[in-house]
A protein has these predicted regions:
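Solvent-exposed, extracytoplasmic
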Residues: 30, 79-102, 178-183
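Amphipathic coiled-coil signal-relay and dimerization helices
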Residues: 114-119
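Bacterial N-terminal signal peptides that target proteins for export
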Residues: 1-9
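Short hydrophobic alpha-helical segments used for membrane anchoring or interfacial signaling
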Residues: 105-112
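Juxtamembrane extracytoplasmic/periplasmic/luminal helical "stalk" adjacent to the first N-terminal
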Residues: 22-76, 100-102, 142
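Extracytoplasmic/periplasmic sensor domains and loops in membrane signaling proteins
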Residues: 77-93, 120-149
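Conserved beta-strands of PAS-like sensory domains
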Residues: 155-183
Length: 183
């Protein structure tokens, strides 16, 4: 009986700690998020972003690169630095640095959800199967329903994403992590 009670308490504490990681979005936050959503739709149409995604889609994903292998790479590796220093990486870093309290990460992905450019190394290389990629790639502007720690930065974040289009065709996704405490 005592061990069952201890187990129940353990399960409840573990569940409660997981709940504390996510937080509701307030009406004030939503108003600010909506402003960012409008902004990222414009960013997703920037010719530098569109051209980088078109080129990356033509090359394809890095051969044999999966999420497990990606996690083993040092963020200072030249491969990773290339995503930050290519034309799209420089542009998204400029956008983030213009709003350092509001934006903590930007990631550009191609049509196979492979990374094209980013401001800092994301936790995964392939985003397919995640709502932030799948919803935006279907042509919708996507928003995370609550704030929670970003997997790579651990900053309490609300992620938003917009489709990157070439004409009317969706060719990639622009993901922006907003710092929840500044919304």
């Amino acid at each position: 009986m005592v061990s069952s009670l201890k187990y129940l308490v353990f399960v409840l504490v573990a569940f409660a700690s997981q709940l504390s990681l996510a937080a509701d979005i307030t009406p004030k936050m939503q108003k600010n998020i909506d402003v960012y959503k409008t902004k990222i739709v414009q960013w997703a149409a920037d010719p530098v972003i569109v051209n980088a995604v078109k080129e990356a889609n033509a090359r394809g994903a890095i051969p044999m690169m999966g999420n497990a292998k990606w996690r083993e790479i040092d963020p200072k590796d030249p491969l990773i630095q290339g995503f930050e220093t290519n034309a799209a990486g420089v542009l998204v870093t400029k956008w983030m640095n213009a709003d350092p309290k509001g934006i903590n990460k930007i990631v550009v992905s191609g049509n196979k959800s492979q990374r094209v450019a980013f401001t800092s190394m994301p936790a995964i290389y392939i985003g397919k199967g995640k709502p932030n990629f799948d919803e935006a790639f279907s042509g919708k502007v996507w928003q995370q329903p609550e704030s929670k720690p970003d997997p790579s930065t651990q900053i309490d974040t609300v992620q938003i994403a917009a489709p990157i289009k070439d004409g009317g065709e969706v060719i990639g996704v622009l993901l922006v992590s907003l710092t929840a405490s500044n919304l």
